[in-house]
Amino acid sequence: MSAAVAAPARTRLTHLQRLEAESIHIFREAVAEAENPVMLYSIGKDSSVLLHLALKAFAPGRLPFPLLHIDTTWKFREMIAFRDRRAKELGLELIVHTNQDGLAKGIGPVSHGSEVHTDVMKTQALRQALDTYKYDVAFGGARRDEEASRAKERIVSLRNAQHRWDPKRQRAEPWHLYNFKKRRGESFRVFPLSNWTELDIWLYIEQENIPIVPLYFAAERPVVERDGQLIMVDDDRFPLEPGETPQQRQVRFRTLGCYPLTGAVESPAATLPEIIGETLAARTSERQGRVIDKDGAGAMERKKQEGYF
């Protein structure tokens, strides 16, 4: 009588492995349904993780979509250098789009304020690019834990022909089943990192040794204090107030955007373990340094309804 064959032991995935598997599944499902997909690449830590997951999802082949960066011309210089270096290292197709009409009018965060700048140089610019290249699926790195309006958005988010988001038209997503049916002119924003947290992102960056912009690590940087925010003076376009002089302070950034609209935090965290330790102890959102989130009640939801990332 033959001996009974023991059933194979069940492999228990770690928390990060489950998140990784979900994100890869989302990428593959969306690409299978898409006619012309693209990945929105904003150069920050979430975009770096998103790109890493996309490369894993379609390895050993090339990415089946290009990267699209909406360049407001006001990003930190280190961000642009990092973007160009990574695209070259990985052999990626990178499309950079700037709203030329807004550029010609001199629209900027200092001269016109955060709300006008964000609308013209980010939202309108993104809509222009999506229309020009006729993308029907755009991957983004937004996470639900970042902000209230993002918390209620679906992983597969339907946008109308004007790229607007209607929270009342969201679709159910039971058992990781996603509905990609759409009418002519409609499109989708797809968020593979929806269920990740800021801590998950940092733990995964450490685990996978993912390159990120050096601005996330503490260093001596020239900053001025404006409205309770430490703003880094990244170039000579930033106007100093009478008697104001940039001070060298040890700071880093929890989130990155246009430099006049992004506040730094004082911190000694110069390594990934130190950043993870700070994240564990944090009692405020990483987006506390984003000036655009303070453009009135419901600012982010209103921006998203207008077509923002």
Swiss-Prot record:
Keyword Ligase belongs to the record: no
GO biological process annotation, one example: sulfate assimilation
Keywords on record: ATP-binding, Nucleotide-binding, Nucleotidyltransferase, Transferase
Family annotation (Pfam families): PAPS_reduct
EC number(s) stated in the UniProt entry for this protein: 2.7.7.4
Reaction(s) the record says it catalyses: sulfate + ATP + H(+) = adenosine 5'-phosphosulfate + diphosphate
InterPro entries noted in UniProt: PAPS_reduct_dom (IPR002500), Rossmann-like_a/b/a_fold (IPR014729), SO4_adenylTrfase_ssu (IPR011784), Sulfate_adenylyltrnsfr_sub2 (IPR050128)
Pathway it works in: Sulfur metabolism; hydrogen sulfide biosynthesis; sulfite from sulfate: step 1/3
GO molecular function: ATP binding; sulfate adenylyltransferase (ATP) activity
Domain of life: Bacteria
Job of this protein: With CysN forms the ATP sulfurylase (ATPS) that catalyzes the adenylation of sulfate producing adenosine 5'-phosphosulfate (APS) and diphosphate, the first enzymatic step in sulfur assimilation pathway. APS synthesis involves the formation of a high-energy phosphoric-sulfuric acid anhydride bond driven by GTP hydrolysis by CysN coupled to ATP hydrolysis by CysD.
PANTHER family: SULFATE ADENYLYLTRANSFERASE SUBUNIT 2
Subunit structure: Heterodimer composed of CysD, the smaller subunit, and CysN.
Family: Belongs to the PAPS reductase family. CysD subfamily.
Protein name: Sulfate adenylyltransferase subunit 2
Gene: cysD
